[in-house]
Amino acid sequence: MKYRLIGVGASLVVAVMLTGCQAKATTLVKSDAGQVTQAEVFKQIENQATTQQAVQELTLNKVLNQRYHVSQAEVTAKLKAFKRQAGANYHMILERNHVTEPRLKSQIKANLLMEKAVSAKYPVTKAQLKKARAAYMPMTTVQHIATTNEKQAQKIIAELNAGASFDSQVRKYQNNRQAHTTAGKLAQFDSYNQTLAPAIVQATAKLRVGHYVTKPVKTVMATADTKDKPTYEIINVVSRRSKTAAVTDDSGKQIDVTNYLREKIQQQRMMDKQTQVATIRSVFKAAHVKVVDAHFAPAFNDYLTTQNS
């Protein structure tokens, strides 16, 4: 699962400032021109967007922490999954977003709390699982040939139709040494893949094992070789796992396909803005959240009804 890091640092800094705002006489800076007090800083920042966001996040985290429990083991598992996805870029990602690992853990915990809130409000039904299972393409291995020339792509397919092997076509039309070494094979992927162009995943799902596309698959993805030019892909399905086979989840753990599909359905819901808003409204209402300081009312406009505020 992906985590949004941008803005986390700023929100946390403001949040720390706000948690101590009751001591309004506290002097933060002294100079010949006078003192800068915490009350002055609070007045300066209270209407800023980052401050509004920080107040909203503090409130949400308090409410969710009271209603749901996230263990340290759960946070650690998600952190390991994030590190595995980021690979060698892990520390660079943190540095670019001005986030330390402890702050990342806090954000992961907040995400997990929200996941549990969404799951509680919108439990996955048998009908939804049945639909997901029917649409699911399990882990599949494909060979591919990519070209920016549509006519050449059509020629490659014509030669395949005439009896040429896919391996020979890879050697003939791909200049990439790695493609020659792997016979054009891509890493295994399923229908939930978010790395490849959606058109490639969709085309693959329609093919049976041992079959290739009858028309080139057009994609537009920036790569070192193609820049932003349209790319025409010829795809051949080499193998496909059973729909009932165990699947490796985001944490690297083997789980049965039903739990995997349930996890994916919930992840998709977490990306849906309307679902998030409805869930937050629900937990705020249950916790009787009320904005006392009118300056912070805008932060809750989407989440509180007139009766609550």
Curated annotation (Swiss-Prot):
This is Foldase protein PrsA 2. Residues 137-232 form the PpiC domain. Plays a major role in protein secretion by helping the post-translocational extracellular folding of several secreted proteins. It is a lipid-anchor. Its EC number is 5.2.1.8. It catalyses: [protein]-peptidylproline (omega=180) = [protein]-peptidylproline (omega=0). One of its GO terms (cellular component) is plasma membrane. Keywords: Cell membrane, Isomerase, Lipoprotein, Membrane, Palmitate, Rotamase, Signal. GO terms for biological process: protein folding. Residues 1-20 form the signal peptide. It comes from Lactiplantibacillus plantarum (strain ATCC BAA-793 / NCIMB 8826 / WCFS1). It comes from the Bacteria. Belongs to the PrsA family. A lipid is attached at C21 (N-palmitoyl cysteine). It is found in: Cell membrane. It is an enzyme of class 5 (isomerase). A lipid is attached at C21 (S-diacylglycerol cysteine). HAMAP family: Foldase_PrsA. One of its GO terms (molecular function) is peptidyl-prolyl cis-trans isomerase activity. The keyword Ion transport does not apply.
